[in-house]
């Protein structure tokens, strides 16, 4: 599989280049150039097919021109000692839980996969690379855990003062580890601004072989595609009608990943989500992308620090806009409807749902008519452990789940006793001193 840019279809790079130099110079984002038809393979999987096996097979389908099937299987096995879980909670209602990770965050699937792909690429090239990202918790903790002991990868992580979590003394680069944590005298927004400024400096990007661990990097995003064939492998013998997925939008990464699964011929009949500032419902009830009003070449460059995958989402339907109306079903959800959905999940199924999951379920309830037509089943995507959003749950329900010990340990606050910085130049100078 080759990868092209959302801004220039003449661009064609391999997987290694798309992961290493993850931001195309035209200001767009990398996307798959084409998709293989994997329907026969997807239909062959069943409830005994492990998540790692599915990931290994799909990796081979994505990048078989670069890695052998054995290497692809090894990458997936190392990346995924954990797995999502699909649960049946009612006759036609299922949950897809993505929080069975050390940090309780769905992000860990993509980060672990990206790091193991990158380490393989760098070993083959005899090279090194450095992640540069802003974090307030889960991303940094996941990345530090996964790159621990890796020989070719370092990470520079920017945190607002007092927000470093999930790092241990052995992770610090000054103790022989792989992570350079830097506290910023400012908010998370300031951290992201510094990352953007550094990525705009091409000479620094090339000097340190900088890349990102967020979903601007196609290697991080592709891992989320594996969720949906995995879910289908568990669903296929339990349902006979259509299958719809309802999910929070976030930065649209899981929605795009689900649609990539569909492009690989995954049996799916539609995706439901709450409306956002960018995705609305028109008067006829159809999906409408507000950003499409502005041509790509008139937009700013894609954000390497806090990315939106909306541009990738638009590209999927660029050649067939009518498909958007018959495959993506947004619903406008109010605060009250979100709280009602949260209470319904708890009262009916004893499920603690965070705010984003509750919004996704509320959206599904409002688009119930599309599922009633053919006795369709709904898969509710639950991204992060509900205990990470316990304040909202306690406010809504009067009770909340306890934080599992594995998550509290993985996200423990860390002190580094180093001076704070306030500019991109100070970060660059710190990198020069430590590397």
Residue map of PLM features:
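PLP-dependent amino-acid enzyme catalytic core
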Residues: 1-435
């Amino acid at each position: 599989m080759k990868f092209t840019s959302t801004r220039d279809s003449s661009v064609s790079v391999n997987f290694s280049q798309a992961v290493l130099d993850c931001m195309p110079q035209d200001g767009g984002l990398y996307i798959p150039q084409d998709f293989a038809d994997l329907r026969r393979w997807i239909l062959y999987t069943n409830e005994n097919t492990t998540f790692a096996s599915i990931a290994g097979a799909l990796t081979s389908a994505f990048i078989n021109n670069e890695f052998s099937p054995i290497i692809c299987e090894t990458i997936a096995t190392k990346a995924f000692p954990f797995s999502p879980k699909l649960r049946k909670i009612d006759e036609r209602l299922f949950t897809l839980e993505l929080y069975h990770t050390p940090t309780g965050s769905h992000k860990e699937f993509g980060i672990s996969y990206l790091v193991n792909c990158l380490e393989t690429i760098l070993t083959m090239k005899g090279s090194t690379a450095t992640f540069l990202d802003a974090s307030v918790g889960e991303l940094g903790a996941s990345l530090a855990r996964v790159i621990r002991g890796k020989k070719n990868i370092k990470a520079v992580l920017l945190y607002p003062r007092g927000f470093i979590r999930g790092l241990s003394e052995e992770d610090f680069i000054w103790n022989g580890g792989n992570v350079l944590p830097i506290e910023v005298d400012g908010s998370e927004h300031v951290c992201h601004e510094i990352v953007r400024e550094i990525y705009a400096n091409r000479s620094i990007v090339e000097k340190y072989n900088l890349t990102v661990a967020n979903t601007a990097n196609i290697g991080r995003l592709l891992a989320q595609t594996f969720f949906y064939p995995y879910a289908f492998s568990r669903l296929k013998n339990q349902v006979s009608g259509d299958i719809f997925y309802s999910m929070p939008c976030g930065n649209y990464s899981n929605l795009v990943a689900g649609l990539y699964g569909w492009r690989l011929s995954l049996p799916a009949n539609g995706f439901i989500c709450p409306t956002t500032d960018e995705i609305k419902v028109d008067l006829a009830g159809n999906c409408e992308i507000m950003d499409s009003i502005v041509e790509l070449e008139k937009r700013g460059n894609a954000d390497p620090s806090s990315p939106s995958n909306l541009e990738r989402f638009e590209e999927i339907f660029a050649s067939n806009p009518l498909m958007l109306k018959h495959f993506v079903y947004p619903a406008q959800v109010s605060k009250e409807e979100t709280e009602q959905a949260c209470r319904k999940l708890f009262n009916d199924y004893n499920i603690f749902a965070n705010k984003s999951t509750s919004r996704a379920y509320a959206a599904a309830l409002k688009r119930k008519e599309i599922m009633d037509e053919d006795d369709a089943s709904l898969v509710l995507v639950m991204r992060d452990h509900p205990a990470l959003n316990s304040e909202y749950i306690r406010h809504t329900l009067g009770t909340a789940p306890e934080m599992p010990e594995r998550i509290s340990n993985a996200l423990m606050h860390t002190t580094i006793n180093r001076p704070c910085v306030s500019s991109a130049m100070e970060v660059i100078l710190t990198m020069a001193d430590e590397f």
